[in-house]
């Protein structure tokens, strides 16, 4: 009878240990809601847009509700982690504790160098005048829609030109970006 009591006690202790081990919440697997006051985050298209041209990668990492060590920026190919330089359109953004991979969309940048140049102005003009072979779509259309109104228009071209000539980016003074 005493042996039976010891066995029951041993089984009870093992069950308690297993419950204790398997019921612990591992902080590394909790999904966190991604937030930023600087950038527009789209869960639908998995993009982070409204990134100002020439934004340093370290500065970019500090603009989220996570520690910068938990933000990882990868080259457009998705394999090489970028530790310095500027963020460019098409770069891949991963976060510890968040399953989704996001794509960076720098305002006005479509050649992935993180800047606005005559190349982007030329592409925007060709799109606006309707040249069929030069119509922008996807992340490039989002990048060239610098005023964020959902369309690429002469106003966007004008803003791009002013930026290249004067170095000022006028994007409606938006403090809180909206996702496309």
Model-derived features: positions:
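Cellulosome-associated attachment modules in secreted, modular CAZymes
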Residues: 23-29, 37-180
């Amino acid at each position: 009878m005493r042996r039976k009591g010891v066995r029951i006690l041993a089984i009870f202790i093992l069950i308690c240990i297993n419950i204790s081990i398997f019921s612990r919440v591992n902080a590394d697997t909790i999904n966190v809601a991604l937030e930023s006051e600087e950038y527009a985050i789209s869960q639908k298209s998995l993009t982070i847009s409204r990134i100002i041209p020439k934004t340093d990668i370290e500065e970019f990492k500090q603009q989220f509700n996570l520690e910068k060590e938990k933000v990882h920026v990868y080259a457009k190919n998705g394999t090489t982690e970028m530790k310095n330089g500027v963020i460019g359109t098409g770069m891949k953004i991963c976060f510890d504790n968040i399953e989704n991979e996001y794509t960076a969309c720098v305002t006005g940048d479509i050649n992935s160098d993180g800047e606005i140049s005559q190349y982007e102005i030329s592409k925007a003009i060709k799109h606006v005048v309707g040249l069929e072979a030069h119509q922008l779509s996807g992340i490039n259309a989002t990048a060239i829609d610098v005023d964020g109104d959902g369309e690429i228009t002469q106003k966007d071209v004008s803003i791009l030109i002013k930026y290249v000539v004067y170095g000022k980016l006028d994007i409606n003074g938006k403090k809180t970006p909206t996702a496309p």
